[in-house]
A protein has these predicted regions:
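Bacterial N-terminal signal peptides
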Residues: 7-18
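Short boundary/loop segments of OB/S1/cold-shock single-stranded nucleic-acid-binding domains
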Residues: 25-48
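Short aromatic-glycine-enriched beta-strand elements
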Residues: 60-70
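Beta-strand/loop nucleic-acid-binding surfaces
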Residues: 78-94
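OB-fold/S1-family single-stranded nucleic acid-binding modules
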Residues: 111-142
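Short nucleic-acid-contacting surface segments enriched for D/E, G, S/T with interspersed K/R
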Residues: 89-106
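Conserved hydrophobic positions within beta-strands
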Residues: 52-54
Length: 146
C-alpha cells in the first residue's frame, strides 16, 4: 500500500512539474512549431541524412513530435517531425531516452520547397533516427498504418 501511494504521489508531482515546464513561452512556441511542422507536406525526392546533436525535443499531446538538431561543425539546424507520442513510445522513444546533447543520425526528407520553420530551421520529416552506435530509436516504417 505504501509503495502504491508513493507511486501515485510521484506521478502527481511529475504531472504538476510538467505542467509548469510546458507553460513557459518557449515551450508554447516549440509546441506550436511542432504542430505546424506535422501539417507540412514533404518531398520524397529530397532526402537528407544528418549526424547531429539534439538541441530540443517536443512531445505535444495532439500532434507529431518534433526534434530540433544542430549539425556539428556547421550552422545548419533542422526541425524533424516524428510521430505522435504513443507511437514513439511503442518504439521506446521518449523524453527519457532522447535528451538534449545526445548525438544522433537522422535520415528523412525535407519539406516541399525547402521551407524553414522557426528561426531558420530546415523543416524535415524524420524517417529513421539512430544513435551513433547504431541503436535504432525511431523507424517510420514500423508505425501502424492508419
Amino acid at each position: 500500500m505504501k509503495t502504491q501511494s508513493a507511486g501515485i504521489l510521484l506521478a502527481m508531482l511529475l504531472g504538476i512539474a510538467s505542467c509548469f515546464a510546458q507553460g513557459n513561452p518557449e515551450s508554447i512556441a516549440l509546441t506550436n512549431a511542432a504542430q505546424t511542422l506535422s501539417a507540412m507536406a514533404f518531398d520524397s525526392g529530397s532526402g537528407v541524412t544528418v549526424h547531429a546533436r539534439v538541441a530540443s525535443a517536443v512531445w505535444p499531446e495532439r500532434a507529431a513530435g518534433m526534434i530540433v538538431v544542430e549539425v556539428g561543425g556547421s550552422t545548419e539546424k533542422y526541425a524533424f517531425s516524428t510521430a505522435g507520442v504513443p507511437a514513439m513510445a511503442k518504439q521506446g522513444l521518449s523524453r527519457f531516452t532522447l535528451k538534449p546533447g545526445d548525438e544522433i543520425i537522422v535520415t528523412g526528407v525535407l519539406a516541399n520547397g525547402n521551407l524553414k520553420i522557426g528561426p531558420g530551421f530546415n523543416a524535415a520529416r524524420a524517417d529513421l533516427i539512430t544513435r551513433i552506435d547504431g541503436t535504432r530509436l525511431f523507424d517510420r516504417t514500423q508505425l501502424p498504418l492508419r
